[in-house]
Amino acid sequence: MSKGILGKKVGMTQVFAENGDVIPVTVIEAAPNVVLQKKTVDSDGYEAVQLGFDDQKQNNANKPEKGHAAKAETAPKRFIKEIRGVNLDEFEVGQEIKVDAFAEGDIVDVTGTSKGKGFAGAIKRHNQARGPMSHGSRYHRRPGSMGPVDPNRVFKGKALPGRMGGEQVTVQNLEIIKVDAERNLLLVKGNVPGAKKSYVTVRSAIKSK
């Protein structure tokens, strides 16, 4: 069955394997999550468990958020996500989920919000090739052709300049190098999306071999 936990990206560092290899890792702080709700086929049409992470000030939460958290006897949460594909019998509302749910060697998918880059051109945003920079060329870093004359419009999806980043990104099949239960830390091999202190979701990999 699938497993999942919510956390906050701390940053990157490196650890040494037993054979001396250097492994780049991302540190994810995953303080105990609280099960806020169990969704069933009868009531919601699908099965999932709703987790909450990072307490929110009571003054910043509205009345529905406070009432939803009160059912689990906890404080309102800043970050709430659902994890599907789990065995609902293993969860109870108000239960805490800790990092020891995962083990070293587990393969996971990590979802986060990519760093915002602001308004970017087609070369940076879509890896488009630039034009010649000399020999009389007047086409350097522009978007290029908008398409043929006949449709008399620009097709959806045309690679054009625009706001880059700030999107949901999932990096798949990352290995958990270490689980630090005392400090509520997960060390994941490689990089994960987002800036430092941004929220991430760690789930069991769906395409792992």
UniProtKB/Swiss-Prot annotation:
GO terms for cellular component: cytosolic large ribosomal subunit. It comes from the Bacteria. GO terms for biological process: translation. Residues 128-152 are annotated as: Disordered. Gene3D superfamilies: 3.30.160.810, Translation factors. Transmembrane segments: none annotated. Keywords: Ribonucleoprotein, Ribosomal protein, RNA-binding, rRNA-binding. GO terms for molecular function: rRNA binding; structural constituent of ribosome. Belongs to the universal ribosomal protein uL3 family. Part of the 50S ribosomal subunit. Forms a cluster with proteins L14 and L19. This is Large ribosomal subunit protein uL3. It comes from Halalkalibacterium halodurans (strain ATCC BAA-125 / DSM 18197 / FERM 7344 / JCM 9153 / C-125) (Bacillus halodurans). The gene is rplC.
